[in-house]
Each structure stands twice: as C-alpha cells, then as structure tokens.
C-alpha cells in the first residue's frame, strides 16, 4: 500500500466509523503537544500523563488541544504511559455518550457538542421542528394570502399588444 493510499484509508476510517470501546480503553482529552508525536493528556480519572501517537496516525491525522482520544495503557516505559488508539471526532463523542460509556468528568464538553447547545436551545424533543414537514394548518394560512387567477384574466393579458419603439431595430413590417 502506498503512502498516499494509507493516508486516505486512515483519514476515511477516522472520519466515518464509530468506535466501540474495549474494557481497557481510557478516554482522555489532549492538553498539549510535547513534540516528536508525544501528547500530554488528561484522562477520565483526572491523571495527566504523556501518550504516543502510533505511526498509522502520523502525518495523516492531526490533533488539536482539547480534542478527545482513546488511549490504551502500556506497561513498558517510564515517561510514556499509553498509546493513542483512536481519535474521537464530534460524532463519536456523541455516539459514546448515547451508549452511556462517556465519563462524567467530560460530560460538560460533550454537552457543548450537541445540536441544541450549538443552537442555544434546550429541549427534550426527539425531532427538531425545522426537520418536520409543514402541518396542514400552516399550508391553509399560506394559501389564504395568495391570489387566485381566472382563465379569463390570462386571456385578456395575451390579447393586449404594446407598441414599443426601439431605435436600434428596423421597423417591423406592418400587418
């Protein structure tokens, strides 16, 4: 597999799949980049430590501060305590939250990602009003304001002729 194909594959995988958490996975928030593919994270237990980014993500996916990642702990090493298993985007965060596996310490950040928070609304409706088709009462109200046209009015408009003068054109032959 060429480098470009690998990059495209990883980018599509991160952007399109929902991640299923495994028992030893830890959800963490990226605090800062330490350089050399090392990142400092704050995990769901409140511990702060350094994790490494695996080679499959390097040069194809970039991390931002306060972004969420799934970390798999590693036993060897003194400074590096884990490896990034998956980079969570907004859809994955909301999906894990719906499953009930989202840590309570990051709940406030997950609430900011919901549709209601972005719109500044708080509602318990399953479907937003703007996603529903218009009701019949709204259609009746709109139709009352419209004018109705008779066929006789249309025929009268067609019979009218206008004499216009255009100096750039030759005179039309008379009938």
Curated annotation (Swiss-Prot):
Q: Which UniProt keywords apply?
A: RNA-binding
From start to end residue, where is composition biased (Polar residues)? 165-175
Q: Which SUPFAM superfamilies does UniProt cross-reference here? A: Nucleic acid-binding proteins
- Per the UniProt record, one Pfam family is eIF-1a
Segments of skewed composition (Basic and acidic residues): 116-128
| Claim: Nucleotide-binding is one of the keywords in the record | no
Biased composition regions of type Acidic residues, renumbered to the chain: 129-163
Any single GO molecular-function term of the entry would be: RNA binding
Q: Which domain of life is it from?
A: Eukaryota
The segments labelled Disordered in the record are 116-175
Q: Where is each S1-like domain found?
A: 5-89
A single GO CC term for this protein reads:
nucleus
KW RNA-binding (keyword) present: yes
Q: What family is this?
A: Belongs to the EIF1AD family.
Which protein, by its recorded name, is this? Probable RNA-binding protein EIF1AD
């Amino acid at each position: 597999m060429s480098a470009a194909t690998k990059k495209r594959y990883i980018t599509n995988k991160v952007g399109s799949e929902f991640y299923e958490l495994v028992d030893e996975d830890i959800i963490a928030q990226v605090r800062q980049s330490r350089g050399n593919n090392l990142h400092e994270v704050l995990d769901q237990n409140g511990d702060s430590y350094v994790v490494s980014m695996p080679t499959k993500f390097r040069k194809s996916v970039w991390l931002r501060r306060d972004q969420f990642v799934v970390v798999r702990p590693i036993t060897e090493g003194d400074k590096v305590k884990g490896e990034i298993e998956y980079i969570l985007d907004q859809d994955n965060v909301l999906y894990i939250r719906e499953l009930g596996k989202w840590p309570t310490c990051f709940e406030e950040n997950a609430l900011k990602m919901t549709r209601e928070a972005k719109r500044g609304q708080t509602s318990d409706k399953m479907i937003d009003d703007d996603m529903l088709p218009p009701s019949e009462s709204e259609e009746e109200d709109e139709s009352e304001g419209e004018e109705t046209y008779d066929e006789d009015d249309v025929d009268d408009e067609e019979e009218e002729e206008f004499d216009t003068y255009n100096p750039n054109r030759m005179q039309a032959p008379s009938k």
